[in-house]
Amino acid sequence: MKSKTANWFETVIRYDKMQEDGMAKKVNEYYVVEAFSFGDAEEKITEEMSSYISGEFEVRNITPSTYHEIFFSENGNDDRWYKARLQYITFDEKTEKEKRTSVTYLVQASTLNGAVKNIEEAMAGTMSDYVISNISETKFLDVYVKKA
């Protein structure tokens, strides 16, 4: 399990996709790209999609993500993306109360249970106490990182 911390943008692409019956249908597809700015995100997703889509397409939306770290699976069967909210638990000795801080991650896995296992694997090296407070499958088809 590897992870990458960066500025991530969620993008939506719209284009005419050829269906099995030969008819073209307008579809929206969702992707995540690593970028420094909105312009950089648009350039990156346009570059990536131009090699997969023959014909015209448009970038419908670009949104900064709520997460800054993504856990990438090394298992080739993990083809889905899950958004997970973890709560880190700390103890405030002054007030003698438990404090929880929420952090959101994007996790690659094939199933919901697989996503939980991948989170546990990624968090195994940390000393922090945490709980998974929410996890849900996303519509993202892929994540594109900057090339070195």
Regions found by a protein language model. Give the residues of each.
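Short, structured motif recognition centered on aromatic/hydrophobic residues
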Residues: A6-I13, E29-V32, A41, I45, ...
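Conserved aromatic
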Residues: A35-F36, A109
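Short aromatic-glycine-(Arg/Gly/Cys) micro-motifs in beta-strand/loop hairpins
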Residues: K2-K26, G76-R100
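A cross-family "folded-core" feature that marks the main globular domain of proteins
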Residues: W8, V12-R14, M23, K44, ...
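A cross-kingdom feature marking solvent-exposed beta-strand/loop segments within repeated
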Residues: K17-E34, S51-S54, K97-Y105, G125-I132
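Mixed-charge, glycine-accented linear interaction segment located at domain edges/termini
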Residues: E96, V103-Y144
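Short, mixed-charge low-complexity intrinsically disordered segments
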Residues: S50-F91, G125-A148
